[in-house]
UniProtKB/Swiss-Prot annotation:
GO terms for molecular function: ATP binding; ligase activity, forming carbon-nitrogen bonds; zinc ion binding. Catalyzes the ATP-dependent conversion of 7-carboxy-7-deazaguanine (CDG) to 7-cyano-7-deazaguanine (preQ(0)). Keywords: ATP-binding, Ligase, Metal-binding, Nucleotide-binding, Queuosine biosynthesis, Zinc. Its cofactor is Zn(2+). Zn(2+) binds at residues 189, 199, 202, 205. One of its GO terms (biological process) is queuosine biosynthetic process. It comes from the Bacteria. Belongs to the QueC family. Pathway: Purine metabolism; 7-cyano-7-deazaguanine biosynthesis. The gene is queC. This is 7-cyano-7-deazaguanine synthase. It comes from Pseudomonas aeruginosa (strain ATCC 15692 / DSM 22644 / CIP 104116 / JCM 14847 / LMG 12228 / 1C / PRS 101 / PAO1). InterPro entries: QueC (IPR018317), Rossmann-like_a/b/a_fold (IPR014729).
Length: 224
């Protein structure tokens, strides 16, 4: 019997690393995809490669995209500062249509691989309020995927799996530790330095630190 395959979006951060471990524990042959899209630092891409090796994925791809030219986000436009305190509404670290673009490319690879499952580490509990992390988005993308692909119209539909959707950050960390994730390999900070050290001030750093504290697990994050 052939092992079921999954394409997994792997940013190099805590959430996506956990998703890879979950998929592997569920018996999937894991194919991971990361994006060099003009983000502020490459440390997360290096982290993604480390995580892919540690968790033993079948293949890890890094896709080049230039989102700098569009701007519109503190993660792709150096002229927009990364906020270091909570704000109302959708934060400036939101990258326009990022998850839509990333999932579309993962969908293409999944169709080539004859993989029926695509995993993404979005979360609607301890998150920054991005519209493309909501359950409604995941459900809508799955419907689109099955309308827009050869596999979908031939009855071999895709599933967009978001296993972290309703978990707290502490629950995510506990799930990853139980499945052997080395969180010391991951980078979550929006403005990490070249060594992957975190600022400890941005929204992503706060969510990560609070999650480790709530989980009762030592935080391996290095700070500059």
């Amino acid at each position: 019997m052939n092992q079921k395959k999954a394409v997994i979006l792997l940013s190099g951060g805590l959430d996506s690393a956990t998703v890879v471990a979950m998929a592997k524990a569920d018996g999937y042959a894991c194919y991971t995809m990361s994006f060099d899209y003009g983000q502020r630092h490459r440390a997360e891409l290096q982290a993604a490669e480390r995580v892919a090796r540690q968790l033993g994925v079948i293949e890890h791809k890094v896709i080049g995209l230039d989102l700098n030219g569009m701007g519109g986000s503190a993660l792709t436009d150096e002229s927009i500062a990364v906020p270091e305190s909570p704000s109302e509404g959708i934060p400036v670290t939101y990258v326009p249509a990022r998850n839509t673009v990333f999932l579309s490319l993962a969908l293409g690879w999944a169709e080539v691989l004859d993989a029926r499952d695509i995993f993404i580490g979005v979360n609607a509990v301890d998150y920054s309020g991005y519209p493309d992390c909501r359950p409604e988005f995941v459900e809508a993308f799955e419907r689109m995927a099955n309308l827009a692909t050869k596999a979908g119209v031939e009855g071999n539909g895709f599933r967009i799996q978001a296993p972290l959707q309703y978990l707290s950050k502490a629950q995510i960390i506990q799930a990853g530790v139980a499945r052997g994730v080395d969180y010391g390999l991951t980078v979550s900070c929006y403005q990490a330095d070249e060594q992957g050290r975190a600022c400890g001030k941005c929204d992503s750093c706060r969510l990560r630190a609070d999650g480790f504290a709530a989980a009762g697990i030592s935080d391996p994050t290095p700070y500059f």
